[in-house]
């Protein structure tokens, strides 16, 4: 809805466009009834009515959180609103808080004063090592259990081991196996919830010769020295 179909739903952390390294994971389908069942099995209770349900924990506390989003990105603000509406159907109250980018970055990168954040992650190249700054437990860009002197969990320690192993491995298949295990761990633990991979599109005049857009940045000008305009 918010991206006009110009995106691919994600089942894992890596875009399926990264065909060399992305692991094909089972799709996560929208299933409201299954979500309700899982919440009830976990001990939550639903109060209110069908039009305005209220989800509460076993102690009677209302399930609610604030979702911060950079106000400069209208698409992400719209996505946050869709998330808010979807979770309301389960009785979960979400307060969407659009923030100026500087304040958004301060909270997500410095003070960590937020419940949940809607952000984007991009890498400069498809190689697995380019994801290390976000996945490695000691990285300043690591969003869950931040600023770790050592891994807080066994599964994060395992990811650290796998990232180090694939970085020193010269065999492509063994590198792929290690990075696939990283993706399986992330899909199981779900420290971040993947939503979509946005599509990139470029438009150029037919008069431009040698235009060959790339999937990597800079998408349109990587071969700038070869581009020229064919005069009529």
Which residue stretches match the model-derived regions?
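Short, solvent-exposed loop/beta-turn-alpha elements that line the ligand-binding surface or hinge
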Residues: 20-34, 49-63, 108-113, 133-164, ...
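Structural recognition of the beta-strand scaffold that forms the well-ordered cores
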Residues: 1, 11-13, 65-68, 95-98, ...
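Bilobed periplasmic-binding protein-like "clamshell/Venus-flytrap" ligand-binding domains
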Residues: 44-70, 117-120, 167-206
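Solvent-exposed loop/turn segments at secondary-structure junctions
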Residues: 5-9, 18-21, 71-75, 101-103, ...
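Conserved structured core elements
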Residues: 4, 8, 29, 33, ...
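Periplasmic binding protein-like
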Residues: 88-142
């Amino acid at each position: 809805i918010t991206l006009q179909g110009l995106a691919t739903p994600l089942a894992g952390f890596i875009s399926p466009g990264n065909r060399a390294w992305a692991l094909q994971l089972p799709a996560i389908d929208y299933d409201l009834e299954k979500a309700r069942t899982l919440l009830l099995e976990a001990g939550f209770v639903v109060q209110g009515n069908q039009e305005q349900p209220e989800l509460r924990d076993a102690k009677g506390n209302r399930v609610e959180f604030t979702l911060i989003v950079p106000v400069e990105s209208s698409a992400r603000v719209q996505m946050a609103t869709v998330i808010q509406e979807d979770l309301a159907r389960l009785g979960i109250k979400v307060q969407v808080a659009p923030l100026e980018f500087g304040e958004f970055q301060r909270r997500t990168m410095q003070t960590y004063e937020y419940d949940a954040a809607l952000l984007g992650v991009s890498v400069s190249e498809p190689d697995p090592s380019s994801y290390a700054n976000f996945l490695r437990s000691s990285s300043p860009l690591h969003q869950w259990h931040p600023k770790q002197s050592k891994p807080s969990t066994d599964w994060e320690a395992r990811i650290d081991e796998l990232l180090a192993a694939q970085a020193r491995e010269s065999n492509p298949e063994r590198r792929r196996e290690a990075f696939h295990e990283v993706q399986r761990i992330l899909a199981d633990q779900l420290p971040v919830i993947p939503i979509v991979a946005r599509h990139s599109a470029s438009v150029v005049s037919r008069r431009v010769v040698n235009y060959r857009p790339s999937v990597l940045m800079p998408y349109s000008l990587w071969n700038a020295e070869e581009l020229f305009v064919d005069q009529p």
